[in-house]
């Protein structure tokens, strides 16, 4: 380690490892801390050898000490470890870092007092970090060390001209001459923008210097002149002159310090540019800790770098002025000019107490005012409660305790046997419950009353005269959330006067009171005989009350309370009586708006906070038929993870989310734990992959992202549903399959087994069930408030309405109450009542919306993954920021690249990114949709073939977007415009349900001409055409018929694949010809060159015949933009022509000029290819009308020729060649439908996976005829699943009977819905087209249907495997049989491992996976390699273990033991 290892000797190293990092902490210093400190010294230009002595450490501390108050955490850590090393060198005994800092600072203060005062700066002693030093009475310049320059470069590169750069420059340039400073600037010269800013500041300051210090005139010979501005900047002065100006005896001019000040001004301007946050904008958030606010404040303050007096003023005024109201109140109480340490200490306990104050004030308000009418309260009975009803016999007039009838068996709540009332599933879960004493506690049923109030009750209270009629209503000694204060006090006094009875009911043990948290639990308590009302608050440590006197035996104490600190009196061992129990605890008295009992009293009372479980009905869940639950062993876990899982499981069990699995449960799923993002807490994960495989399928969860372009509403509120999964119960019959085992450390005891009672995370059904449950909960509320917009996405709910503030708040309150009543929690900290609302990446206001702040990443090295994320952010921003472009950035990651592959930026991509950054810096706002206002869409074309559009209502922009999908190298502007219109139409239909009026940059005539002949899209919305000034037009005029009397050019090109040499040329019908020799070309390029040659040499009107389908395809598309130079030349020439006819003729067989030109360009290049099978292929197509791939497969002709044959057929050229593709479904899945043609009924069945069809004409569309057809189909082909629409014939009993007898699962969809039975609907269309082609070959419709079915099954090739549907179906059946056979053969080789030896090596290797066992050898798989090993060199063992985790160190041990056993064998 060099000098790093010599910093401390062996003895001092031992002493270092005894010093603690923090007072009272467990962690101690290690040698790695010294190594880290050595590396950090380079940043400050300090030699690592300084750490080897006490004096050296003292020099380091002098440099670092002034920077510590405003420095970063790394700087403070470096200062701390240097203090510890200093104390070790000084032989000072220290226990921890704080002691070392005190001793080091004491030594620094003593040395400062000993230093003599000087009036002018002098050069430092030898060995300092200064370039000018005094040797023998003369000043000598030493160049800056590479370490100093390296530290400066590192500082700039790492901080990116952040606030730390300015103080870093001050420290590193101390004592430097202008020459040295220029050397530092040259080291970071690649930052051109920053350097230009600094140069401008230098020029301005130099001009000001020259104006303020005019030249005195000619100087005597030999006398040193006064420095000019350029001299200070080091451009017209030497190093010697700079030293003389700095250190001359009379009138020294500190040119170095002056130049440093200029550079600092420039750096400050750079910092402000790179870090635009102003010190005035640094304000503390309502819940932001004061320390975090101070860190941000000082970071921005360092960027200011103003005069120390100004900085001091900012600290004393702005720091306090911009704090939140709670901290500001505390800070003002500290008096004038408090120190930073005092401010941090005073605000340490405040983390947004304003919120706490509002909550407590709300609690007090709710306790003293009537509750609002809850949702659907009209369905609940009003009035007082009825008479007492016995739970045992059901009669009125007495309670169950007084009942003389025999005790009824089973639950008193629901009447069912098998459980008691305390465990009744219909009982509402209690939140706050006293722990049971003695036997199991009997818990009474508990639900909110009709008025929304909550009550407290014990079983013996009905005997005191309380009314408990209504079954679920529970009386209370005091009403906690409704009624007036007088009734609260009256009820409390009555309860106190009644004699206290023992809460014991027969043999059922102690019955504890329950407190629901639908409202805040306010109860009456007696403190040393003084009656008070208190709020039970489990979020507070201490208890504090007001308005009582407990004597003079107290301890003064200051606690963080509402609005700041509260002076209180703390009394210990005070007698408190609450809810029938007497305890002695510590309590404080002081000025508090509401009395609180905190955890110190609640724990003494035995109260716990219990999690609610939703009262929604569990969804029935089953395993797949014939499947069983997972039985996978738990893999070993580390001690740390076991303890973490134990704590998590115990907490979940207390909250009712888990329960202990019975010993008869045979199922198990592995569990493990990972660290959360903060690295302090653990998260439990269950590997539900096996359970997911055997669980039934669920509706696919389609969390469609809701847009924020909702209709404009007056008020908006956002609420969050917390822990939704854990609030919904799991089907009790399915819970057994979720069992998992928590192992014990060292297997000291059997693992504890649990099962889930709620929806577990990671299980496939949780999302679907949660979605379904939330919809059922919200549906009644939506119907009751039809004028309110409720958007739910995951656990975020947005409520928007035009109601008044009071009515809107009431709706929100009712929705929250409804969710709480159903068991869903709505955390207050995520409740957003006032704008702006943070929702789904947006900031919402009632009248406008914006995107949340978008920050583009800054990276040194860009990878493919980083580029993908950058494009995603830009695409997200494009919905509001017009002009966002990503074309050149996307080009950076074209091709097959790995995610971690490094990407080099091009100039165009960098320019595009910088342009996007400028766009994102501008403020953009969106508007909401207004009904009955016309919706408009304006399309614009930008450079580089990128399109932008905005959807607006008048001048209110609802949405903007971009389109840049250019799939072809050569494309047409009108075609792209059609795709843009298609995209806008789909978006508008989905979001607003209507098509906008389009403003398009094209003339209607141009559009109509292109659309008639060259349509290329599947769907275009209807619109009212409003053309803007045209930017798009058809570039040239292609005619459909040959031009009479004009010259005809026959073009051709050829290329030798080996030499890449080629020729291009043409021959005309008038005897002209021309050939051009090409090098390094291709056949396609040669064909294009020949076409361009003909265009160049021809008249304004010309006929051109080509034999290249490639050229014909490009010209027919009428491209206007291209990336190919030769195509660009063709476009340029075509624009000049008045009219051009382009024809295509396949091959060159006997076609006059085409054959001649082919012979002309083929000499020495290629052999002529005669396609003799064209005519048979054409005859085959005229007979069967097969598709392109069938012709290619059967006749071996090129695909271009086959495609032209199909396109030339007038019966097949209705809508071009279809794009073939098949949906690969299960082997036994068919779709069936009925269609009509010529008054006949045709029943069609399609095999989904292969496209094979069965079709015939049936006399009637009845269930009987359909059942007969289905039976005929099932007798020919394997069918297990039939999907149809819900027509009467398909839902008839006859069809269902056949399906049951054959064993077919039948599902239904919606008629004519493409998503329901899209395959058979499309096949009906193709079948009718095929019938139309063959109709003239048969008389009856029955015959032509069967002929068309034959052609579609045997004459239509394509899709998966390039097969016909008949070949594909037979292949699939055969493949399925082979798979089943091999699976049966290979099943016995599973779960076996093989250890083997190779060659003469006696060491056993493995284990490998057994693939096959033969008579003389075995085939094994080791990693990705397949090996054949003789039987005599292989040992086969059975593998009994389950899956293994990442930290199962036992696996390696087991493997090692197995190898040793195999070797000994």
From Swiss-Prot:
A zinc finger (Integrase-type) spans 1172-1213. It comes from the Viruses. Residues 7-31 are annotated as: Interaction with Gp41. A motif (Nuclear export signal) lies at residues 16-22. GO terms for cellular component: host cell; host cell nucleus; host cell plasma membrane; host multivesicular body; membrane; viral nucleocapsid; virion membrane. Its EC number is 3.4.23.47, 2.7.7.49, 2.7.7.7, 3.1.26.13. Binds 2 magnesium ions for reverse transcriptase polymerase activity. Mg(2+) 1 binds at residues 720, 795-796. Residues 655-844 form the Reverse transcriptase domain. Protease: The viral protease is inhibited by many synthetic protease inhibitors (PIs), such as amprenavir, atazanavir, indinavir, loprinavir, nelfinavir, ritonavir and saquinavir. Use of protease inhibitors in tritherapy regimens permit more ambitious therapeutic strategies. Reverse transcriptase/ribonuclease H: RT can be inhibited either by nucleoside RT inhibitors (NRTIs) or by non nucleoside RT inhibitors (NNRTIs). The active site is at residue 537. Residues 1222-1373 form the Integrase catalytic domain. Pfam families: Gag_p17, Gag_p24, Gag_p24_C, IN_DBD_C, Integrase_Zn, RNase_H, rve, RVP. A lipid is attached at residue 2 (N-myristoyl glycine). Residues 1392-1439 bind DNA. Mg(2+) 3 binds at residues 1233, 1285, 1321. It catalyses: Endopeptidase for which the P1 residue is preferably hydrophobic; Endohydrolysis of RNA in RNA/DNA hybrids. Three different cleavage modes: 1. sequence-specific internal cleavage of RNA. Human immunodeficiency virus type 1 and Moloney murine leukemia virus enzymes prefer to cleave the RNA strand one nucleotide away from the RNA-DNA junction. 2. RNA 5'-end directed cleavage 13-19 nucleotides from the RNA end. 3. DNA 3'-end directed cleavage 15-20 nucleotides away from the primer terminus; 3'-end directed exonucleolytic cleavage of viral RNA-DNA hybrid; DNA(n) + a 2'-deoxyribonucleoside 5'-triphosphate = DNA(n+1) + diphosphate. Residues 837-845 are annotated as: RT 'primer grip'. Residues 186-223 are annotated as: Interaction with human PPIA/CYPA and NUP153. Its cofactor is Mg(2+). PANTHER family: ENDOGENOUS RETROVIRUS GROUP K MEMBER POL PROTEIN, RNA-DIRECTED DNA POLYMERASE-RELATED. This is Gag-Pol polyprotein.
């Amino acid at each position: 380690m060099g000098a790093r290892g010599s910093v401390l000797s062996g003895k001092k190293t031992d002493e270092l490892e005894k010093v603690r990092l923090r007072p009272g902490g467990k962690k101690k210093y290690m040698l790695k801390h010294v190594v880290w400190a050595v590396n950090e010294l380079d940043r400050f230009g300090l030699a690592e050898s300084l750490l080897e002595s006490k004096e050296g450490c003292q020099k380091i501390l002098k440099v670092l000490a002034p920077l510590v108050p405003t420095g970063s955490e790394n700087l403070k850590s470096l200062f701390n470890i240097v203090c510890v090393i200093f104390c070790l060198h000084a032989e000072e005994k220290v226990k921890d870092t704080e002691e070392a800092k005190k001793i080091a600072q004491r030594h620094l203060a003593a040395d400062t007092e000993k230093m003599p005062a000087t009036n002018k700066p002098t050069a430092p002693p030898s060995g300092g970090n200064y370039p000018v030093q005094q040797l023998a009475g003369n000043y000598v310049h030493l160049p800056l060390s590479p370490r100093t320059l390296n530290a400066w470069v590192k500082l700039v590169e790492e901080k990116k001209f952040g606030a730390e750069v300015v103080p870093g420059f001050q420290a590193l340039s101390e004592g430097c001459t202008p020459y040295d400073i220029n050397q530092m600037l040259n080291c970071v010269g690649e930052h051109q923008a920053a350097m230009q800013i600094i140069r401008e500041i230098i020029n301005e300051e130099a001009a000001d210097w020259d104006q303020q210090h005019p030249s005195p005139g000619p100087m005597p010979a030999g006398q040193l002149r006064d420095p000019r501005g350029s001299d200070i900047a080091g451009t017209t002065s030497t190093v010697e002159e700079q030293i003389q100006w700095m250190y001359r005896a009379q009138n020294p001019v500190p040119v170095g310090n002056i130049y440093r000040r200029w550079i600092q001004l420039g750096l400050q301007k750079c910092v402000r540019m790179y870090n635009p946050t102003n010190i005035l904008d640094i304000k503390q958030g309502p819940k932001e800790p004061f320390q975090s606010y101070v860190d941000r404040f000082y970071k921005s303050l360092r960027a200011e770098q103003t005069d120390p007096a100004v900085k001091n003023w900012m600290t004393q005024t702005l720091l306090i002025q911009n704090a939140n109201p709670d901290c500001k109140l505390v800070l003002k109480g500290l008096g004038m000019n408090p120190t930073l340490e005092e401010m941090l200490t005073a605000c340490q306990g405040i983390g947004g107490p304003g919120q706490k104050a509002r909550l407590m004030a709300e609690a007090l308000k709710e306790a003293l005012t009537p509750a609002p009418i809850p949702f659907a309260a009209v369905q609940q009975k009003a009035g007082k409660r009825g008479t007492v009803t016995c739970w045992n016999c059901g009669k009125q007039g007495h309670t169950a305790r007084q009942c003389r009838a025999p005790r009824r068996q089973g639950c008193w709540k629901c009447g069912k046997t098998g459980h008691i009332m305390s465990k009744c599933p219909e009982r509402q879960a209690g939140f706050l419950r006293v722990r049971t004493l003695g036997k199991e506690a009997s818990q009474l049923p508990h639900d909110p009353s009709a008025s929304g109030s909550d009550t407290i009750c014990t079983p013996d209270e009905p005997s005191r005269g309380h009314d408990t009629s209504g079954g679920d209503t529970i009386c209370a000694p005091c009403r906690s959330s409704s009624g007036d204060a007088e009734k609260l006090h009256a009820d409390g006094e009555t309860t106190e006067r009644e004699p206290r009875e023992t809460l014991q009911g027969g043999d059922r043990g102690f019955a504890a009171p329950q407190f629901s948290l639908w409202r805040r639990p306010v109860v009456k308590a007696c403190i040393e005989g003084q009656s008070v009302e208190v709020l039970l608050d489990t979020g507070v440590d201490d208890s504090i009350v007001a308005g009582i006197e407990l004597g003079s035996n107290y301890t003064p104490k200051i606690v963080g309370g509402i609005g700041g600190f509260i002076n209180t009196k703390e009394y210990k061992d005070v007698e408190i009586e609450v809810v029938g129990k007497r305890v002695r605890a510590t309590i404080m008295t002081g000025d508090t708006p509401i009395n609180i009992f905190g955890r110190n009293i609640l724990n003494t009372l035995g109260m716990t906070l219990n999690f609610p479980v939703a009262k929604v009905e569990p969804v029935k869940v089953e395993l797949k038929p014939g499947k069983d639950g997972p039985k996978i062993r738990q893999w070993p876990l580390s001690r740390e993870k076991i303890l973490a899982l134990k704590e998590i499981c115990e907490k979940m069990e207390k909250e009712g989310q888990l329960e202990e699995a019975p010993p008869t449960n045979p199922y198990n799923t592995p569990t493990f734990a990972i660290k959360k993002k903060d690295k302090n807490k653990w998260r439990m994960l269950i590997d539900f992959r096996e359970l997911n495989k055997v669980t039934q399928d669920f509706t696919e969860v389609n969390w469609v992202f809701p847009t924020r372009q909702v209709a404009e509403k007056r008020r908006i509120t956002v609420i969050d549903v917390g822990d939704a999964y854990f609030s919904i119960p799991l089907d009790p019959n399915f819970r057994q399959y979720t069992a998992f085992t928590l192992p014990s450390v060292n297997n000291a005891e059997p693992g504890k087994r649990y099962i889930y009672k709620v929806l577990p995370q990671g299980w496939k059904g949780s999302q679907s069930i949660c979605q379904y449950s939330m919809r059922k909960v919200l549906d009644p509320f939506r119907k009751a408030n039809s004028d309110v917009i409720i958007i739910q996405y995951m656990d975020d709910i947005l409520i928007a309405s035009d109601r008044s503030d009071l009515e809107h708040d009431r709706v929100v309150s009712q929705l929250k109450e409804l969710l709480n009543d159903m068991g869903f929690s709505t955390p207050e900290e995520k409740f957003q009542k006032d704008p702006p609302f943070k929702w789904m990446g947006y900031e919402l206001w009632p009248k406008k919306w914006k995107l949340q702040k978008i920050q583009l990443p800054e990276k040194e090295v860009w990878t493919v993954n980083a580029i993908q994320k950058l494009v995603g952010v830009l695409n997200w921003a494009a919905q509001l920021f017009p002009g966002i472009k990503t074309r050149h950035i996307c080009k950076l990651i074209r091709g097959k690249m790995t995610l971690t592959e490094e990407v080099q930026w091009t100039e165009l991509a960098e320019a595009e990114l910088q342009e996007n950054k400028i766009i994102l810096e501008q403020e953009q706002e969106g508007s909401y949709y207004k009904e009955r206002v016309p919706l408009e869409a304006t399309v614009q074309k930008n450079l580089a073939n990128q399109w932008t559009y905005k959807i607006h209502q008048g001048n209110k922009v609802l949405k903007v977007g971009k389109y840049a999908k250019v799939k072809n190298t050569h494309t047409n502007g009108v075609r792209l415009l059609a795709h843009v219109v298609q995209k806008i139409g789909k978006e508008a239909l989905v979001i607003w349900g209507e098509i906008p009026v389009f403003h398009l940059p094209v003339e209607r005539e141009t559009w109509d001409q292109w659309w008639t002949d060259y349509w290329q899209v599947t769907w275009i919305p209807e619109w009212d055409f409003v053309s803007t000034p045209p930017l798009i037009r058809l570039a040239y005029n292609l005619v459909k018929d040959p031009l009479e009397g004009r010259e005809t050019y026959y073009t051709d090109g050829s290329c030798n694949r080996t030499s890449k040499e080629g020729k291009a040329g043409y021959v005309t019908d008038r005897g002209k010809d021309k050939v051009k020799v090409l090098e390094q070309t291709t056949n396609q390029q040669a064909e294009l060159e020949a076409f361009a040659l003909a265009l160049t040499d021809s008249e304004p009107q010309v006929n051109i015949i080509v034999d290249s389908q490639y050229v014909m395809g490009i010209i027919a598309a009428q491209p206007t933009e291209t990336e190919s130079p030769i195509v660009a030349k063709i476009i340029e020439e075509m624009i000049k022509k008045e009219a051009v006819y382009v024809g295509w003729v396949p091959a060159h067989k006997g076609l006059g000029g085409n054959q001649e030109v082919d012979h002309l360009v083929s000499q020495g290049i290629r052999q002529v290819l005669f396609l003799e099978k064209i005519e048979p292929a054409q005859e085959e197509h005229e007979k069967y009308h097969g598709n392109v791939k069938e012709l290619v497969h059967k006749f071996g002709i090129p695909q271009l020729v086959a495609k032209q044959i199909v396109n030339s057929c007038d019966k097949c050229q209705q809508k071009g060649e279809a794009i073939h593709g098949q949906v690969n479904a299960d082997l036994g899945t068919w779709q069936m439908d009925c269609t009509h043609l010529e008054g006949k009924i045709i029943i069609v069945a399609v095999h989904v996976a292969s496209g094979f069809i069965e079709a015939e004409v049936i006399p009637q569309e009845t269930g009987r005829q359909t059942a007969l057809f289905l039976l005929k189909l099932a007798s020919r082909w394997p069918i297990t699943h039939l999907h149809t629409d819900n027509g009467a014939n398909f839902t008839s009993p006859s069809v269902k009977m056949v399906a049951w007898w054959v064993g077919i699962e039948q599902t239904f969809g919606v008629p004519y819905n493409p998503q329901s039975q899209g395959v058979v609907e499309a096949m009906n269309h193709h079948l009718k087209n095929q019938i139309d082609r063959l109709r003239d070959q048969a008389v009856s419709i029955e015959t032509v249907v069967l002929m068309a079915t034959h052609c579609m099954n045997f004459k239509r090739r394509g899709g998966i495997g390039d097969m016909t549907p008949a070949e594909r179906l037979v292949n699939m059946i055969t493949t399925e049989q082979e798979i089943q056979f091999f699976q049966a053969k290979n099943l016995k080789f599973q779960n076996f491992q093989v250890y083997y030896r190779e060659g003469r090596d006696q060491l056993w290797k493995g284990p490998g996976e057994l693939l096959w066992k033969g008579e003389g050898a075995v085939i094994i798989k080791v990693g990705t390699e397949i090996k054949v090993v003789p039987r005599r060199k292989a040992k086969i063992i059975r593998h009994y273990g389950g899956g293994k985790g990442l930290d199962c160190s036992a696996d390696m041990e087991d493997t090692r033991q197995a190898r040793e056993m195999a070797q000994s064998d």
